[in-house]
């Protein structure tokens, strides 16, 4: 009986340990708080926070949302996303959009090599210098010299498109 009780206690602690796995890297500022949509603007209808992630319910959503956090033009942006099967969304950076989706099913196929299957978390990174971004998906370069301009005033946004989507651990670091 003691062994069973001990095992149940250990199993009960596993989800709590996973929730704490994320550690904010030095110099980064987190744009989502995992609790609500504070710090985000736009038409918030259909957007919510579920299980610590910004959730897009595409059937309810009316528009895109944008971070209210101001930043300079030379930055590193990191976030995690999870797409429902066939889902399509996007991340706006300085006014330009990178399609974020279930790449193996929805394309573009040239990104599929780096993507995890629908329903799994993917890590996306934008390293922006003087209006050009290198974009990595799960550590693999998917765009080497994406010209995005340097209009930091247009900020960071999340797109409403097709299928349910989750975003979490959205963070930014000013480059020196």
Locate each region found by the language model.
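Sec-dependent N-terminal signal peptides
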Residues: 4-13
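Carbohydrate-interacting regions of secretory-pathway proteins
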Residues: 19-176
């Amino acid at each position: 009986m003691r062994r069973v009780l001990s095992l149940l206690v250990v199993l009960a602690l596993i989800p709590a340990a996973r929730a704490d796995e994320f550690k904010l890297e030095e110099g980064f500022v987190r744009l989502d708080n995992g609790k609500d949509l504070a710090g985000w603007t736009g038409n918030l209808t259909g957007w919510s926070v579920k299980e610590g992630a910004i959730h897009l319910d595409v059937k309810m959503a009316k528009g895109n949302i944008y971070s209210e956090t101001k930043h300079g033009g030379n930055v590193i942006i990191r976030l995690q996303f999870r797409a429902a099967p066939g889902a399509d969304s996007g991340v706006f950076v300085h006014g330009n959009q990178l399609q974020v989706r279930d790449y193996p099913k929805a394309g573009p196929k040239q990104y599929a090599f780096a993507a995890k299957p629908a329903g799994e978390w993917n890590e996306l990174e934008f390293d922006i210098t003087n209006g050009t971004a290198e974009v990595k998906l799960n550590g693999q370069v998917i765009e080497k010299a994406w010209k995005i301009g340097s209009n930091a005033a247009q900020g960071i946004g999340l797109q409403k498109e097709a299928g349910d989507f989750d975003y979490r651990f959205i963070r930014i670091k000013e480059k020196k």
